[in-house]
Swiss-Prot record:
Gene name, Swiss-Prot/TrEMBL: clpP
Pfam families: CLP_protease (PF00574)
Biological process annotations from GO: protein quality control for misfolded or incompletely synthesized proteins
Name of this protein: ATP-dependent Clp protease proteolytic subunit
Organism the protein comes from: Deinococcus radiodurans (strain ATCC 13939 / DSM 20539 / JCM 16871 / CCUG 27074 / LMG 4051 / NBRC 15346 / NCIMB 9279 / VKM B-1422 / R1)
Record localization: Cytoplasm
SUPFAM superfamilies according to UniProt: ClpP/crotonase
Family: Belongs to the peptidase S14 family.
Amino acid sequence: MEVMSVIPYVIEQTGRGERSYDIYSRLLKDRIIFVGTPVESQMANSIVAQLLLLDSQNPEQEIQMYINCPGGEVYAGLAIYDTMRYIKAPVSTICVGMAMSMGSVLLMAGDKGKRMALPNSRIMIHQGSAGFRGNTPDLEVQAKEVLKLRDTLVDIYHKHTDLPQEKLLRDMERDYFMSPEEALKYGLIDQVIDQTRENRGGEE
């Protein structure tokens, strides 16, 4: 049985009456982008468009990107990554739940000092998948492209973590899972957010 996703709507009072927003459009008004699905072309186009819109509105004001992403297509993820690095507006990234594979690339693409994770989130790196399909004659061409993409991802992780490329290659041979604290030591994030209700001074 297929489960239908339900997108909540928010109703706001304006000078012209009531206005209805889907929850993601309402968050976008506050310069919040939510990455909560696997990375693929249509989703990447939407995220890129949101980044470009917010940058055009105010290139000085921070954009917050919340990430709960199981990973996905490398090409689509790199489109988002390059846009995050291209725009002038600073981007903070917050992992809620998980940032796996290309999700971890987006997490570490935030501005230095603004890459965060909630205490029970999980981060995972690996070589990634190009999603190739084809006939036997294409295998050699595809294999070369897979190696090219692997080298590209290693270069990106190296740029943001300063870890030796040899270590990154070893770690990325298999799924490499990390807690937020381990991701902090690894250099993927800058801060583990521990400001939950329990340690905000006993707020009810």
